[in-house]
């Protein structure tokens, strides 16, 4: 079973969203990091796959949907067919993960990335097995209505370094942030 990767940017008060958007002003380099991490495949001829909830899908500006050069799976119990632009629809995270093991996808997919929202992160983080959390810590509080679940530090260890992840504090638009990676293997 392939490892599962979650990627998220979170404010000091654990906020990840506000009114269907990010709680902070656009941070171009942070977004580039998200693009690079979720798009870059380590295997020639394979693509990464992103899994997201319906609200996360619709929070992406239409011109940026689907997330390009990645296979996009949207989760929804209500929708009957994939929203326009999405490659696949699944009823649950488990169904989406089963889909990645089907013959049509098994040999096409390199890394699997969970890109939101809260409930999808929570379910992924509580699954058994090898899971990595790529967390951008926005070092400031922002009013939010959607939050990231607490990271259980009994289970998850903060890695001191991870290839491709800058270790120094970043700053854009007067907002400082840093990239962290947590991992569990059980």
Swiss-Prot record:
Residues involved in NADP(+) binding: 9, 15-21, 54-56, 76-78, 116-123
At which residues is N6-acetyllysine found?
32
Record's GO cellular component terms: cytoplasm; mitochondrion
Task: Tell me which family the UniProt entry assigns to this protein.
Answer: Belongs to the dihydrofolate reductase family.
Q: Which GO terms describe its biological process?
A: dihydrofolate metabolic process; folic acid metabolic process; one-carbon metabolic process; response to methotrexate; tetrahydrofolate biosynthetic process; tetrahydrofolate metabolic process
Pathway listed for it? Cofactor biosynthesis; tetrahydrofolate biosynthesis; 5,6,7,8-tetrahydrofolate from 7,8-dihydrofolate: step 1/1
The record's PROSITE patterns line, in alphabetical order, gives:
DHFR_1, DHFR_2
Chain positions recorded as substrate binding sites: 30-35, 70
Q: What is this protein called?
A: Dihydrofolate reductase
Record's keyword terms, sorted: Acetylation, Cytoplasm, Methotrexate resistance, Mitochondrion, NADP, One-carbon metabolism, Oxidoreductase, RNA-binding
Q: Which residues carry this modification: N6-succinyllysine?
A: 32
Q: What does the protein in this record do?
A: Key enzyme in folate metabolism. Contributes to the de novo mitochondrial thymidylate biosynthesis pathway. Catalyzes an essential reaction for de novo glycine and purine synthesis, and for DNA precursor synthesis. Binds its own mRNA and that of DHFR2.
What compartments host this protein?
A: Mitochondrion; Cytoplasm
Q: Which CDD domains match?
A: DHFR
Which reaction is the catalytic activity of this chain? (6S)-5,6,7,8-tetrahydrofolate + NADP(+) = 7,8-dihydrofolate + NADPH + H(+)
Modified residues annotated as Cysteine derivative in this record: 162
Query: For this protein, what is the EC number?
Result: 1.5.1.3
Q: Which gene encodes it?
A: DHFR
Taxonomically, what lineage is the organism? Eukaryota, Metazoa, Chordata, Craniata, Vertebrata
């Amino acid at each position: 079973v392939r490892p599962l990767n979650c990627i998220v940017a979170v404010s000091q008060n654990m906020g990840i969203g506000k009114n269907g958007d990010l709680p902070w002003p656009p941070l171009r380099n942070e977004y580039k990091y998200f693009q690079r991490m979720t798009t870059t495949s380590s295997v020639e001829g394979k693509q990464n796959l992103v899994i997201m909830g319906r609200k996360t899908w619709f929070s992406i500006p239409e011109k940026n949907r689907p997330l390009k050069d990645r296979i996009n799976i949207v989760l929804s119990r209500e929708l009957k067919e994939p929203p326009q632009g999405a490659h696949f629809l699944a009823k649950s995270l488990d169904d989406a993960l089963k889909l990645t093991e089907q013959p049509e996808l098994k040999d096409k997919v390199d890394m699997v990335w969970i890109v939101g929202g809260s409930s999808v992160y929570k379910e992924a983080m509580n699954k058994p097995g090898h899971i990595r959390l790529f967390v951008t810590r926005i070092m400031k509080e922002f009013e939010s209505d959607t939050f990231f679940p607490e990271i259980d530090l009994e289970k998850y260890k903060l890695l001191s370094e991870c290839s491709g992840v800058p270790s120094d504090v970043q700053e854009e638009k007067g907002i400082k942030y840093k990239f962290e990676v947590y991992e569990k293997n059980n």
